[in-house]
Structures are given as C-alpha cells and as structure tokens.
Amino acid sequence: MLNDHRASSACKNAELLRATAGSRGLSRRDVLRFGALLSAGTALTACASTGSSNPASGSSAASAGRIFRFAQGAAPVQLDPALSPVASTYQVTAQVLQTLLTADHYTGSPDTTDSLCREWKVSDDRLTHTFVLRDNVHFSNGTALTAAAVVQNFQRWQALATGESTAALVVPAQPLYAWGFGVPEQPAQKDASADASATPSATASPTAGASASATADTQSSASPSEDPNSSGSQKGATAKTEATKPEPKPVSFTPLVTSVKEQDGAVVVTLSRPSLAFGCILTQQAFGIIDPALFGSDQKLTSVPVGTGAFRIESSEKGTVRLLPNEHFDGARPQLDEIQISTLTSSDKRYFALVEGMIDACDQVNSSDLGQLARDGYQTPGRDPFSLVYLHLNTAHPVLKNISVRRAISHAVDRGALHQYYPQGTSDAQTLVSPSFRIQADHAKEHTDRNQDLSRSLLATAGYNNQVIECYYPADVSLPWMDTPQKVYSEMVASLIEVGLNIVPVPLTWEEYHAKVNEPSSTRGIALAGFYGMYRDPYAFFGPALAPMIAEQQVRSIVAAAPESMTTGVTAKTVELPSSNGADSNIRIQATPSPQPSFSPAPASPEESASASASPSPTPTPSATAVPVEESPSFLQIMESIRAADSAESVDAQRELYARVVTQLGQFMPAVPLLNVTSKVAVSRSVQGYQTEQNAIEFFSKLRLS
C-alpha cells in the first residue's frame, strides 16, 4: 500500500512537471521548486494520508482518522524543552506539557487559565508565590500530578541551570538560578580613584538556597554622576595599551529562587527579591511539568517527556513526531485523532507539500507565495513582530573584547538590505528589546545608525589589523526568525567586509549551532542569532542576548567552588576559561593580524566550508583615524539596572527603569540588534480554529478538521 502511494505521488509530480514545462519551459526557480516537491514527497510519504482533489481543502484522511499534519522548518534538537529551548522543540512539547501559569493570548499576562493551577497567590511583599494545583490531574501514563512532583521539576531546573555541562543550554532557567538576576550579598567594590571606576561582577549560587562566590571580570564603568540617557557621542579616552586588568575579589550572590517546597498540597516558591518577570517566566514551555520518574541521575530525561497535556508523544523518528490523544487528560477531549509534526527545511518544500495535500499547515511561508496561496483559498495568518534578529558579539573573543570593535560592527551593518528576506511588517531594530514594550530609548539610534566612516575610525582606535573574526550561523534550516540563514548571513557580512573586517563564515548544523552558540569560548566571534520573545516581559529579550556572558560567569563560579583535587572537566582548577575581562574598555587588540582575506559569500553547507571562495576585504581607509571612545557601564552595572527594573512595583515604573538598561546595552554593545521580524503560517481551508501566538508557539488541541 505504501509503495502504491509513493508511485502515485511520483506520477502526479511528473505530470505536474510536464504540464508546467509544456508551453514556456522551466525557470531555475521552477526546477528548484519541483525538486523540493519531490524531496518533500519522499520525506512525508510515510506519514501522508490520501490526498484530496482540492488542495486548498487538504486531505481529509477520513479512512485514517482526523490527522492534523504540520511542517516546520527545523527539527527539534531534542524533546526536552529545558535543554532545548527553541521553537521547533516547543512546538511539539506545547501539545504535551502544561505549565503552572499560562500567558493570556491578548495581553501576555500570566494567568491560570488552561494551566495546572486553580489559584496563584502572591504575598504582600511579593516574595512568596503559592501555586494551588488543580485536583485529579494525571500524567499521560496515569501517574497523578502532585505538589511533590512539581517541586522535583524545580529542583531539576536548578540542577541544569547550575551544572557545568548544561549551564549554557538552559537559558530560560538562568534568571531563576544562575548568575546575576538574584541579590548580591555584598555591594560591588568601587575604585575610589578618579581615573578608574572598575566594579567587580558576580555569579549566582550553584544551589537554590545558598550563596555562591565567583571571580568576575573587572570592567570599567561610566561615571555614576553621568546621565545614562545622555547623548551617545564618542567621548573619553582613546585605546589603552594594557592587555588585561587585575581580577577583583569574588562577590557573593543569592539566586532569585531561594526555596521551593510543598505545603498543604500546594507549591510555595520563595524569592530573594520581588520580580515582575517571575510569573511570566513560568509560562514558557521550558517550565512544562514532566513526570519526575523520567529524571535520570544527571537530571536529563531518560525517554520522551510525559506530561499532563491533551496529547502524548507516540513516536519520534526520521524528522516526524507523532502525537496521540492523552487518555488521562482532564480537559475537553481534542477533536483530532493524531498530530504529525514533520520537518521540511526549505520554504519551497513546505509550500509544495501544502498545495499537494501532503500537509495541512506549515510555518514560515515565503513572501513570494502569499499572494497565490490567498488566491487559492489558503489561510495565511501572521504573527506580530515580537522577535529579534541580532548579532551576538562574544566579549571573551580577543578582538571583540575591545568595545570599539563591537561598536564598529553596529555602525557597519546595513539593516535595510536584509528586509528582502522577510515578510512585510518587519522593521529595523534599534535596541535589543521589542518596540511593543514602549520603552523610550531617545538615544538608541546613536549606537546603531549606519555610519561606515565612524566604523572605520573605531576600528583604527582599537588597533584592528585584519584579525580574523569567525561568524557562526545555522545552515540547512529554516527558523521563524530567519527563513534563509545563508542569504541573511551573506547580505549582512558584506557590509562588515566593506569597512575592513575580516569575517570567516562558520556554517553549523542546527544541532551544532544550538550547542555552541552560548557556550563559554574565546574562539566564537560573532553569531547570527535570533528568537521570538517567549514571554511578555523585557527580560525575554535581554536574557537571550546576554545568555553567553551569564553562562561564562556561571561556569566561572563552578570553577571557583570546585575542590583543588578535581582534574577533569571545566571544574579543573588548572583549566583556562575564556574571560570577558575588560570588555567595557578600549584595551588595544593584541591578537596577531591575519594575512588571509575575508570570505564574502557564505558556503551552502558546513561540508562546503573548506572550499568556500574568498574575496579580498577592503582595508580601512588610510584617512581613518582614532576617535575618542565613549565610556561604558560594566556588565555588573547593567545587571544591577536590570534587577532594579524587574523589582519595580508597577509596569510603568519598570518601563522607565528599563530605559536606562537600553541605553547601557547600547553603550556596552554585547549584541547588535538587526530586525524585529514577523512570520506567516499557511493553513488549508479544512483546518478550523488555527490561532497564531505572539511567541510563534501554537496550540493544536482545539483545532478541528472539516
């Protein structure tokens, strides 16, 4: 039967090719698209049901039950949402796991609707959060949900966020347990001298209830009397020649979450300070509650996650995850008999799989296809641009440690050239936070406006001399925030080459990219990155952009606390960790210049990297001269401002305080904002009730098939 279906599909595809080629021949795009159709058909044959004569109606699959088939552009890195906090994983686990709180569809505010709680109570001092669980809730394996099980989930998140091998992966749990978001146990030490205002950074506790100390990076800061919202004009001293600064004394920190316990059948969470973000953070799929029986000794899952949601995972193989209804679900039974979530990394493959009736809906529709899909009766709902595409700049890199180089990159990028690869509604990003938060950033453009002459002068100030900077980006994948990574990379890097930067592309598989993009490293230079905001709070944007620096500090705290006798792993006392020391200053670049030219076009795949053609990069113009460098706050000061904003008593007060953070991040420049992007979904007419979400993670349990 399966072979018959494949043969039928092949014949149909061949007829379509002949019909199209008959009168006008095939363009290159046609050839690519029909090739995509053939490969998509092969990938989906195993799970495709009988096609309908009307593609826009989808294939009803009456004989096989009500099966909803969805294609996304990236495979789940793994099905553990805590260790794989990416949209492709969340899209699967959102159908399986439930969280303590959910986000209101319209406002994003944390709520108990469709959550595991029937009540959420916050004490007057905002330090104690009590979660009263619903009665008679069971995991899909029949095990009852208890407060003790929820406590074990919190303990797991803590262990992963503070573990040496997982700290860089568990980005959503960083504000709960890792470095910088809790409360410092001693004030930052300030140098009283007039010409040095270094402040030590800090790390979070390895355990939820205890403080920890870590050696942090010495970082010069802006004068305390300086208005943080003042003009961003280039001022201050030119490049310094010293290579390093002395490490300061350790600073102890208490994490945000200090205790989680069961009390009278409820879960009680105690915080070290008030936090406006805390409830919002818990709405993420990373905090979906999983049966603790699956937690291994290393806190990693021993099998696919088992949750309390409307569906359970039946299988996951060959890029397709099959979900079946959870017989123990206590809510309204879904009107679907099965969900199939497959991976098609090309928008052409997804488009033709949709019009051929192989799938019922797909993510990330190519802008050029929207008109035809609408004319053919497909639904094409869009998502708000609650997202960010950016360049992460590794402050532990020997070149990017220099603040003038990071600022030069910000002034070099041509954001306007990137719009051609995104749907209408995409806009330039001037800051690292979504405009929807309405945070005033009066001087933001001074840090991000394109100015090639200033960029070249800043490189001269830093002493840049053609040193190589590697740029990581994901290859052979399609993401909600970047449908065509290779094209976006090539367009972006061209503007960096124009000002004289020597950029070498490092295309990575999706799995490699996810593992390396946040890990402490002095090798990674730039990473082309992005995300959709996963919860309705500004830290949903600041957190991912700062995650690599937070991970570095967290690993540093683990090393500081490790016994002298340990000789393996990153806990070895002799290990040399990458350091962001001096990342807020203009310490002159010490790295050896490279005779190699810069790579202009990106290779099509990691395998082609070695044979990628190179083109000489323009050198900085001879007239480029050093310029005064504006002072920057330290990373510790930025985190201090973030904590102050998050502790505010109201959203309005928070907004004003976060304006300071936006300015500080513009000065420090740990990442270069590029775009706030939107994306589209294509859905056949047979699907009813499809509702897009601001965070690009949709729920399928309430869908209906006609």
What feature does the model see in each segment?
Residues 119-176, 180, 268:
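Aromatic- and charge-enriched surface segment that lines or borders ligand/interaction sites
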Residues 427-462, 468, 476-487:
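Structural transition elements
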Residues 2, 10-18, 37-38, 413-439, ...:
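Detector for C-terminal structural segments
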Residues 105-107, 193, 197-255, 264-266, ...:
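Gly/Pro-rich hinge or "lid" segments in bacterial periplasmic/extracellular proteins
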Residues 71-124, 306:
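N-terminal lobe/hinge region of extracytoplasmic solute-binding protein
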Residues 17-42, 46:
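N-terminal secretory signal peptides and thylakoid transit peptides that target proteins
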